[in-house]
Amino acid sequence: SKADVSIILKDKKNNTANGTTDKNGMLILPASEHKAYIFGYADGTFRPDNNMSRAEAAAIFARLISEQKGEKISGKSNFNDVSKSEWYSDYIGYLSKYGIIKGYSDNTFRPDDNVSRAEFVAMTVRFNSLFNDVKKGSYTVKYTDVATNYWAYSDVAYAKHAGWLN
C-alpha cells in the first residue's frame, strides 16, 4: 500500500470527512474531522488512573451514537437514581431510548459504580447492533469464568467471535 493517499468519506447524510492513508493503507482522520468522545474534568484534570464509572461509559457511547446518527443527545431516564439535574441524565436517557444500557432489577442504574468489563462489552455489542446486523446466540466462548448462564454470555461470545476480545 501507498502512504498519504487522500481519501474523502461520505456518510448517509452526505457529510464528508477528509483523511489520508498510512503506510499500511489504514485511514487516518485528523482530529478536526470527528468529535471527542472522552472528556476531561471541570477542574482541568484527566485522571488517567481512575476507573471509569457507568455514567462516564454511558456518555462515551451516547456521543458515538449522536455523531453517527447526527442527533442531539437528550432523553428522559426512568431510573430511580438518575436525577434530571445530574450531568449524565441526558446521556443515560438517550442510551435507554436505544436499548444500549440496562439497569438493575431495583430500577436503578448506579451511575457512580465502576463499569465492569462485561457491562462494557454488552454496551459495545448493543452499540454495534444499532448500525450492523448482529446475530448473537450461536457463538460460544471458553473463558473459565464466564458460564453459559452468565447474564452477558452471548455478548461476550459475540465480541470474542468478532475479534474484539483476545
Regions found by a protein language model. Give the residues of each.
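Feature responds to low-complexity, polar/acidic, surface-exposed segments characteristic
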Residues: K23-A55, F61-S89, K97-Y98, K102-V121, ...
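Short, ordered, surface-exposed loop/turn motifs in non-cytosolic proteins
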Residues: S1-K12
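Short, acidic Ser/Thr/Gly-rich low-complexity loop/linker segments typical of extracellular
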Residues: K12-L27
